């Protein structure tokens, strides 16, 4: 199921994992100011991303799913958010200012509303499909960059965080859980999950565009509002 979802969204997926900003991070040539702006938005994004995973746990059908999702949430709360805060400090930013007065830009806000809505109103598989492109794409974009880490330690450390074996193992757990929960989906279920996955992947591209200072592009398909066939949870 997870591989089918990724293959159905190949153009957006390729745009996310090979974005010009990602390539500049790998080369160590991205201006620090640009990377700082990325972290200012990503910290806000990750807080709601963690909330979305918490909502998905509430829909988990069994203890095995709760176990996998709890590790996923723990990685975000205990590793990734603190790392983003530390990166922001290294780049001269103020995490305290983000906590006090940080404001989501439109793409960040729209993306997180999609995650929270789908995770609250949909099934466990729906919610997991929504949050998966973020986790999975970061592992995939970092893996090839591990072969030649940039000289700049900020960029090298960021790549290593997502290119490590531990992160890859976590992604494998998450994709395996989705494969189990979704099972052999019928055409209607496959269309719904594909829609959710595609929306999240397009938002990943838009987030990179926003951080890089580019127009967001078409991003979300005009259908908008709910997956094909029915709204999640209805």
Regions picked out by a protein language model, each given a short descriptive name:
Residues 10-15, 30-59, 78-79, 129-139, ...:
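Alpha-helical bundle segments that constitute or directly flank the non-heme di-iron/ferroxidase center
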Residues 224-234:
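Long, low-complexity, intrinsically disordered segments
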Residues 1-5, 114-117, 206-209:
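Hydrophobic alpha-helical segments
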Residues 167-197:
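Long amphipathic all-alpha helical oligomerization modules
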Residues 21-27, 115-117, 180-187:
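Short, charged/polar, low-complexity loop and linker segments
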Residues 1-22, 165-176:
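Acidic, low-complexity proline/glycine-rich segments
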Residues 66-166, 198, 202:
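Active-site-proximal alpha-helical scaffolds that flank and shape metal-associated catalytic sites
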Residues 192-221, 234:
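Acidic, carboxylate-rich catalytic segments that either coordinate divalent cations
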